[in-house]
Regions:
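Divalent metal-dependent catalytic cores for phosphoryl transfer on phosphate-bearing substrates
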Residues: 1-180
Length: 183
């Protein structure tokens, strides 16, 4: 479930509750009742990036943390090897770094899920920088290291396994709708 931790982000939750008022505002939603495609208040918002940053904030330095971070980031096939702002993406003037709708200093609340515990986390984007910074090696350096370690085909295979598992879990949840539903 770490791959959907970013669904706890305020931008994502605002989007989820847009079509229905919260019965319990403390209960996060993972799926929306809105018809059509999701539009977030921040253009280009990707919950996968928030999930990956939350994972690394709590697990960086552990065995295979970069691989898990990569798989979290890539689980919808939109973001993989680079962290960057999109063309025409704009942040508030107060934010130093921003990418894919995530602003430096955004936060994720604490969450208990599947026997895991995620602490409240402030998201940092120093990984966007080149070289080694205050979060260690840049994301580009980490991703290229994974590419070198696993090769493009094995890395793509691992990504495919995670994406298929996510699709199957989503399909199973839709067969048995829940009230709310933790990310």
């Amino acid at each position: 479930r770490w791959h959907d931790l970013g669904k706890l982000h305020a931008v994502f939750q605002d989007s989820m509750y847009r079509c229905r008022p919260p019965a319990d505002p403390a209960q996060p939603l993972a799926k929306s009742d809105c018809a059509g495609s999701m539009r977030h208040s921040r253009s280009f918002f990707r919950h996968e990036l928030a999930s990956m940053l939350g994972w690394l904030a709590q697990h960086d330095g552990e065995a295979d943390a970069d691989l898990i971070a990569y798989l979290i980031l890539a689980h919808h096939g939109k973001v993989r090897m680079s962290l960057r702002a999109m063309p025409n993406e704009q942040a508030d003037p107060d934010f130093r770094r921003f990418a894919r709708g995530i602003h430096e200093g955004d936060s994720l609340p604490a969450m208990e899920f599947d026997g895991e515990h995620s602490v409240a986390t402030t998201l940092r984007l120093a990984l966007m920088e080149i070289g080694i910074g205050d979060q260690g090696p840049s994301w580009s350096e980490r991703a290229l290291g994974l590419l070198e370690r696993f090769g493009p085909f094995r890395l793509a295979w691992l990504e495919t396994l995670v994406r298929l598992a996510d699709w199957r879990a989503s399909a199973a949840e839709q067969l048995e709708p829940r009230q709310g539903g933790n990310p």
